[in-house]
């Protein structure tokens, strides 16, 4: 299985299919295979997929603590290095939840590497006004004893019995640090995005409320917003609709990549 050495850790990734490159960035507590399980078989028929496990997740190394640059900066640097090392850029970038934040951070860090953005179940900003309940949730998740036995079992299966608690604690600290910033904005430069951008949102999402995707849509010039009837994990809850929406978006903006 391929690994890429980045910022002192070994980053696991998978490659699937042939065609124009597409980077799939999973969300918190998932893996590339887990969160994109319904997309990889379909998208790989037309695209060269890069599906990494973000630092601290799955088969990528789990740092014991987050030191130096914050989590999002390190994870973004990992993705820039991975795409550059494979020589596959520019890439279409599809990010879910936390992965949508990393997708936009990748654009800000290296816009020449990004051909298009698909931002799924993300948020234009995170603050106490809109997401106060989420802030309290992430504070509680810093204590692994606060989560349900069912989720603990799932995390152990995905990330290892000895590593999932470190994952929770690290990401909890990273999110709380973001909340603590004065501007508390993940997509602080959304108005500067100039590549084709699709935003996909679950209409019943309580993790990232619809109003936040609407704000993001209003901030990104010429972006498109599609709201599907489901909760947070849109790629898994509405896989057929989601796949059709994404492929239609790419076909319209890049018709030469998939000539009929």
Predicted segments with their positions:
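Flexible "cap/lid" loop of the alpha/beta hydrolase fold
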Residues: 101-109, 114-148
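Acidic catalytic loop of the alpha/beta-hydrolase fold
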Residues: 203-208, 232-233
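Active-site nucleophile elbow and catalytic-triad environment of alpha/beta-hydrolase enzymes
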Residues: 173-189
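Catalytic active-site module of serine/aspartate enzymes centered on a nucleophile-bearing elbow/loop
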Residues: 223-260
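Short beta-strand/loop motif that positions the catalytic acidic residue
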Residues: 193, 199-201
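The serine-hydrolase catalytic nucleophile loop
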Residues: 28-40
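Active-site glycine-rich loops that stabilize anionic/oxyanionic intermediates
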Residues: 19, 27-31, 97
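Active-site loop/oxyanion-hole signature of alpha/beta-hydrolase fold enzymes
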Residues: 37, 41-44, 50-94
